[in-house]
Amino acid sequence: MLIQEHQPASACHIGHYQRGQIEIDGHIYRQAVLLDGSGSVQTVNLASAAELQAADLARAAASQPEVILIGTGERQQFLHPRIAAAASGIGVECMPTAAAVRTYLLLQSEGRRVWAWLWP
């Protein structure tokens, strides 16, 4: 039986993550990035997930992903409940970036719509 991995056309390929950097589509990023499900990678000028605003999550929710992942770096941090509430019923999951990368890749391989903010 021939088995082939299905990679959605809009998918970003995360090659690896290590403290301080993330490799996405062959490029090394040393600052936070946003993967919005369109296949593009946007750098984010925020020092930590704590700087995310309700408007950021509302913008993500407007595109109706199934889940929003927040990779908070080496240690898990949580968003203020008021910020997370702006996602309008869409699941917001905060976790260390290594776990967020694994979760993103798994959900992406299933063809699920997912947004991710990742801090290296």
What do the predicted segments below correspond to?
Residues 1-55, 63, 109-120:
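Non-catalytic interface/targeting segments
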Residues 53-58, 102:
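A generic local structural motif
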Residues 89-109:
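C-terminal structural segments of small proteins and small subunits
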